[in-house]
Amino acid sequence: MDNDVKLGRFISLILRHKPETINLKLDKNGWANTKELIEKISKSGREIDFEILERIVNENNKKRYSFNEDKTKIRAVQGHSIEVNLELKEVVPPAILYHGTAFKTLESIKKEGIKKMSRQHVHLSADIETAKNVATRHSGKYIILEIDTEAMLKENYKFYLSENKVWLTDFVPSKFIKF
């Protein structure tokens, strides 16, 4: 694993889950001061400067991070386990979305639906290929579930679209899932 990937994972840990690891404060919307992030990561023994950080942000294939307009602030665009307000606006999704998951979770999902677990939202994909990539990141055996978002909308479920095009919702009851 190259240094940018390792550093990117560490930045993800900091901005999505544990800013206290390097004693970093995020504002209520999940933004960190870019200069402070670089300084505190450097103090933790990792090599980073603005050029490296910018490369990680720009080249991350999942587009996990974004800068504000003048690049003085940075945040993760979704996937937080800590409470942040990403200022997401409600959006009408396509009629069908997909959820890729480990096969071992299937029975639980049939009984309880898809829960956000430790995150702020359930993550859904607009296409099967993306859902497959999500499902295979931790486990070999996976399943792709089809979500009837049109029916969910009729029952007043809300959907949001993150900056990196991940569809988000609070919960998917099993009655809206095609197994």
From Swiss-Prot:
Superkingdom: Bacteria
Gene Ontology MF terms in the entry: NAD+ poly-ADP-ribosyltransferase activity; tRNA 2'-phosphotransferase activity
Enzyme class: transferase
Keyword NAD: yes
Biological process according to GO: tRNA processing; tRNA splicing, via endonucleolytic cleavage and ligation
Keywords, sorted A to Z: NAD, Transferase
EC number(s) reported in the record: 2.7.1.-
Keyword hit for Acyltransferase: no
Chain's role: Removes the 2'-phosphate from RNA via an intermediate in which the phosphate is ADP-ribosylated by NAD followed by a presumed transesterification to release the RNA and generate ADP-ribose 1''-2''-cyclic phosphate (APPR>P). May function as an ADP-ribosylase.
Annotated family: Belongs to the KptA/TPT1 family.
Protein name: Probable RNA 2'-phosphotransferase
Organism per entry: Fusobacterium nucleatum subsp. nucleatum (strain ATCC 25586 / DSM 15643 / BCRC 10681 / CIP 101130 / JCM 8532 / KCTC 2640 / LMG 13131 / VPI 4355)
Encoding gene per record: kptA
